[in-house]
Amino acid sequence: MNTSLILNSPYILPLDSIQATLPLAGGKGANLARLKRATFPVPDGFILTTRAYWDFLAATGLEAAILAQLATLDLDHPETLEAASQHLRRLFSAGPLPPDTAGELSAAYQKLGGGAVAVRSSATAEDLPELSFAGQQDTYLNVLGFERLGQAV
């Protein structure tokens, strides 16, 4: 991962951006951008980059919480993995978007017209031969309004 590239990238990329690479946009985002640039019929949209994710972790202190949770896992007891996952999910849901990210997200949403949108996850490690995230990430359809968009993100 090129940390400098990520830390110097925008929070939002247009869906047809040439910058929408796997490290910045995840697999789905990068592939949708490629299709859009090739003039396939892809709905308008935008990509929230991995910079937004890393800034969210820093602003909320979640990186430390994740590392602390990982240090306490007992891999011999799968139920602890589920409990840790649920705990971290609650922490992520409770964390507010940093103001810069929220501002750019709001502007991108309004540029689309402020109507109902779909929010799709896009992992930077998905679709790799040695990893599979199929069915493990959420999709939110018919998300209407910035407050709901922020919650879905």
Kindly label every feature range from the protein language model.
Residues 1-153:
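N-terminal beta-alpha lobe that positions the nucleotide/phosphoryl donor
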